[in-house]
């Protein structure tokens, strides 16, 4: 039986492992960027990586930045693990260059096809644009201006209108409806005046702006001017001469693009549009750019992957590193990489031992401020603001409350890829996986013993330092960990029988210590010959004649040797033998 979605499921699991850095056995380094991946996956899709891993076992592969850009490689990596490839006029060249260098032939083919579709960008002559004057033959009756990327952002706010050209009326554009606010229409401009609509650069940064001019076999003199200014603004101005006395239309679209980009995705095309209804979500440019800017400023950037909303675009860019697996901040002491700079700063403190956040009550230091807040709430009676709705227990952090709530709901979202066991906490899954791998990253500096869990190392180190921070408030006994303290309270202070002293519980005594500390050893000098040992021996009927009565130290009588043994013994007999030395 073959499962149709088995391959997709495998790729999905591998991609999740890559994003989490789990079982990744290689790191691709491009400048300051690092990408975790699996060798066998890369070698399966790239002849370049296949050749490298046949000849070397190095974990790190350094790629030439002039040949492979980080953004292009990121898209290529996503294609390898997901099978999806999003190409546009901005990234197609970088992806094609990276795929060609790494010998990913399938992507090279796709990029070539896509670049042919974008050929009008590299060859403006195909659009028949005259720099000064010219005649453009328009075949249909529609003039449509589409701003594609802005479509998805202002879908609910911007009206969708179709700008139609009617030579008899003498107007190329006319609004079909009026909004509540007063706006100036395109057809209200005077002859020779240019109205420039400026959009925020981040809106049009990846936008694809296409201007479709069609008329019913209309030959109209038109002035087209394409000028690239020094500040990297590409301004496309269309001035239609006043051939009809009723209306004059002047349209200007300003598209800002970043420095270093080859050509913006903006072109003047001629199309024979047989079915105008098939064109959806076409937007009419408003002459009031200020109002559009105000509406756009209210929109907050949102992650397309998880839906999280951010106050600033820079926060979104940092957040996207989590989904892409990009970790540009590397520790120079141990080589560990992080997605954010503050994570690296906190990590470096584990090497330096710096703890800048001090508790005012006990002078204990912490590497992070959140650790200090948690400590104060746990040990110094500060308010625990997070309360469980089911059992009313209060917690110091929201994450602790979330984990606790899973006890009531039974939710266990973290699954082991090896055995299928589920866990409520991610850290518990991490410790569980180490049982499979045998990894023990926490090593004692004193004796060299290694542990899979950091708390085990902390408890172990107290044996070297003699620290016993857990004290019983009833009797004053102290312990190295909370587990032994709870055990002590259960056995000693719950009405059960008394157990040994806490020192014996913490450090079990050996045989020699038990003899030396026995009450008998303080009063009597016990010799081995004075100790009788009860032995249980199974005796058969034929063995009964071997039993000899022993009275004091007198030898048995001669006739006793001939006396028959008693019959009917059904239970094992206890014979006390005196040890002879």
Swiss-Prot record:
Gene Ontology biological process terms, A to Z: negative regulation of transcription by RNA polymerase II; regulation of cytokine production; regulation of immune system process
Phosphoserine modification, residue list: 288
PROSITE patterns found in the cross-reference section: BTB, ZINC_FINGER_C2H2_1, ZINC_FINGER_C2H2_2
Residues covered by region (Disordered): 167-193
InterPro entries named in the record: BTB/POZ_dom, SKP1/BTB/POZ_sf, Znf_C2H2_sf, Znf_C2H2_type, ZnFinger_BTB_dom_contain
PANTHER family from the UniProt entry: AGAP004733-PA (PTHR46105), ZINC FINGER AND BTB DOMAIN-CONTAINING PROTEIN 44 ISOFORM X1 (PTHR46105:SF5)
SUPFAM superfamilies found in the cross-reference section: beta-beta-alpha zinc fingers (SSF57667), POZ domain (SSF54695)
One GO CC term, this protein: nucleoplasm
Keyword Transcription regulation: yes
Keyword line: DNA-binding, Metal-binding, Nucleus, Phosphoprotein, Repeat, Transcription, Transcription regulation, Zinc, Zinc-finger
A matching Pfam family: zf-C2H2_6
Renumbered zinc finger spans (C2H2-type): 301-323, 329-351, 357-380, 386-408, 414-436, 442-464, 470-493
Compartments where located: Nucleus
Motif Nuclear localization signal: where in chain: 174-190, 256-261
Membership in a protein family: Belongs to the krueppel C2H2-type zinc-finger protein family.
GO MF annotation terms: DNA-binding transcription repressor activity, RNA polymerase II-specific; RNA polymerase II cis-regulatory region sequence-specific DNA binding; zinc ion binding
Domain annotation BTB: ranges: 24-89
Protein name per Swiss-Prot or TrEMBL: Myoneurin
Source organism, top-level taxon: Eukaryota
């Amino acid at each position: 039986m073959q499962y149709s979605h088995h391959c997709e499921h495998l790729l999905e699991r591998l991609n999740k492992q890559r994003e989490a850095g789990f079982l990744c056995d290689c790191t691709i380094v491009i400048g300051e960027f690092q990408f975790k991946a699996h060798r066998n996956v890369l070698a399966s899709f790239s002849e370049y990586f296949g050749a490298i891993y046949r000849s070397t076992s190095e974990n790190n592969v350094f790629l030439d930045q002039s040949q492979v850009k980080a953004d292009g490689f990121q898209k290529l990596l996503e294609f390898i693990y997901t099978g999806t490839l999003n190409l546009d006029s901005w990234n197609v060249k970088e992806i094609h260059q990276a795929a060609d260098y790494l010998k990913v032939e399938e992507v090279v083919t796709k990029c070539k096809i896509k670049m042919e579709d974008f050929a009008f960008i590299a060859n403006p002559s195909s659009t028949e644009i005259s720099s000064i004057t010219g005649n453009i033959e328009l075949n249909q009756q529609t003039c449509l201006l589409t701003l594609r990327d802005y479509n998805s952002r202002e879908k609910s706010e911007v009206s969708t209108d179709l700008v139609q050209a009617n030579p008899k009326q003498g107007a190329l554009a006319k609004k079909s409806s009026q909004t509540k606010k007063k706006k100036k229409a395109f057809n209200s401009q005077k002859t020779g005046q240019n109205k420039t609509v400026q959009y925020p650069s981040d809106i049009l940064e990846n936008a694809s702006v296409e201007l479709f001019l069609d008329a019913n076999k209309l030959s109209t003199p038109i002035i087209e001017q394409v000028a690239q200014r020094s500040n990297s603004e590409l301004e496309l101005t269309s001035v239609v001469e006043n051939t009809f006395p009723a209306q004059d239309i002047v349209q200007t679209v300003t598209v800002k693009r970043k420095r270093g980009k080859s050509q913006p995705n903006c072109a003047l095309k001629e199309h024979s549009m047989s079915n105008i209804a098939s064109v959806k979500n076409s937007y009419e440019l408003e002459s009031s750019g200020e109002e559009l800017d105000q509406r756009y400023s209210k929109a907050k950037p949102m992650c397309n992957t998880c839906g999280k909303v951010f106050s600033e675009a820079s926060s979104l860019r940092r957040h996207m590193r989590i989904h892409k697996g990009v970790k540009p901040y590397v520790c120079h002491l141990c080589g560990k990489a992080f997605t954010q700079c503050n994570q690296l700063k906190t990590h470096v403190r584990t090497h330096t031992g710096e703890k800048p956040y001090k508790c005012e009550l006990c002078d204990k230091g912490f590497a992070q401020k959140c650790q200090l807040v948690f400590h104060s709430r746990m040990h110094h009676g500060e308010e625990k603001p997070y309360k469980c709705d089911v059992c009313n227990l209060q917690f110091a952090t929201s994450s602790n409350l979330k984990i606790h709530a899973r006890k009531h709901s039974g939710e266990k979202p973290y699954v082991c890829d090896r055995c299928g066991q589920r866990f409520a906490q991610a850290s518990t899954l991490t410790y569980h996986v180490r049982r499979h791998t045998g990894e023990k990253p926490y090593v004692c500096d004193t004796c060299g013993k290694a542990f899979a869990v950091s708390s085990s190392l902390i408890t172990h180190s107290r044996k070297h330092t003699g620290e016993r921070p857990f004290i019983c408030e009833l009797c004053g006994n102290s312990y190295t960990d909370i587990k032994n303290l709870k055990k002590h309270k259960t056995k000693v202070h719950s009405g059960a029988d008394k157990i040994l002293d806490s020192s014996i519980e913490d450090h079990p005594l050996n045989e020699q210590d038990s003899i030396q500390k026995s009450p008998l050893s303080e009063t009597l000098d016990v010799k081995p010959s004075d100790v009788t040992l009860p032995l249980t021996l199974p005796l058969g009927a034929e063995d009964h004649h071997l039993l000899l009565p022993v009275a004091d130290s007198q030898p048995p009588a001669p006739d006793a040797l001939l006396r028959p043994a008693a019959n009917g013994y059904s239970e094992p007999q206890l014979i006390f033998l005196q040890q002879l030395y």
